[in-house]
Amino acid sequence: MAGVLEGVRILDFGRYIAGPWCAGLLADLGAEVIRVDKIGGGEDRFVVPITDEGDGAMYQQMNRNKRGMTLNPTSPEGKEILCRMVERADVVVANLPEKALVSLGLDYESLTAIKSDIILTTTTAFGTQGPFSEKIGFDPVAQGMSGLMHLTGYEEPMRSAASWVDFNTAT
């Protein structure tokens, strides 16, 4: 049975949970998803527990149903490859701060200069404006800053074992 997103091509520049989970859900629905890692592989590949194959179990779960490649989008050859990939893609998924998107050529203006109807979906811990917009944040940071840890800890604040913020943001 064909998925509802069959024929849709997605470039996944997501890291850790929110981006990869979002792209993984789209892959589950039939989209062709290409996970693009930095040369040498993404740092989220090695989050424990590590499988016998050397990959983190979470990395394998987040990247199921995807193809993968490595790319340096800041090198001349990498920029050319990225341009060709964007020309053939429908959606780009990334969860990086705005400055990182711009430096990699993954910001909306750069992408639409290549393909006018490309869809860019991004998520960041602190949004694109404001004093924390360029900071990187993970689920435990959001839990702590929002007060959630105070609700789950007794007597001291405690992080929830599940990364609720990341998973809910991705969906």
Feature map (PLM): residue ranges:
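N-terminal helix-loop segment corresponding to the beta1-alpha1 unit
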Residues: M1-T171
